[in-house]
Amino acid sequence: SEVMVLSHVLAAELEDARAGHNAEFTVEGTVPDVRVTANEMLSSVFRNLLNNAVQHNDSDHPEVTVSVDTDEDRVVVDIADNGPGVPDGQKTDIFGKGERGIDSPGTGLGLHLVYTFVEQFGGDVWVTDNDPRGAVFHVELPLAE
């Protein structure tokens, strides 16, 4: 693994997502200039989550909001959408191998890979409800020394 600048990785993936989707991607606040220990798969983590936020979105105007929060030793990236959300019973299951939305296309490997990579980086990933609707995926990563 190597030390990576989080804002660079995130900015590149957001640029690709904006180019590839008819959706609104907003960054709330500023992305702190922090470094994390990861590898090039960190890009895949954000790409998967940004793509999912649009692909599984049933809204006429998909909106995805990214925000980043940091403290002394970790950073949390939140990717929030205005889609159908994730039922409570599936919030842990969706990161399992081969799990996918009830009626959504795809191999179901996306979130499992996200979970696997984030765990390799010493981090954590989980999902909560967005308000008033949608899902928020949280990616927590330890800061590089």
State each model region's role.
Residues 24-35:
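Conserved catalytic submotifs in the C-terminal HATPase_c
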Residues 52-57:
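Short helix-loop "hinge" at the ATP-lid/N-box region of the Bergerat-fold HATPase_c
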Residues 63-73:
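Short beta-strand/loop element within the Bergerat-fold HATPase_c
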Residues 81:
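Acidic ATP/Mg2+-coordinating residue in the GHKL
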Residues 86-98:
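Short conserved segment of the HATPase_c
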Residues 110, 114:
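Short alpha-helical Gxxx[C/S/T] motif in the catalytic ATP-binding
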Residues 117-119:
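Detector for a conserved hydrophobic position within an alpha-helical segment of the HATPase_c
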Residues 123-124:
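Conserved glycine-rich
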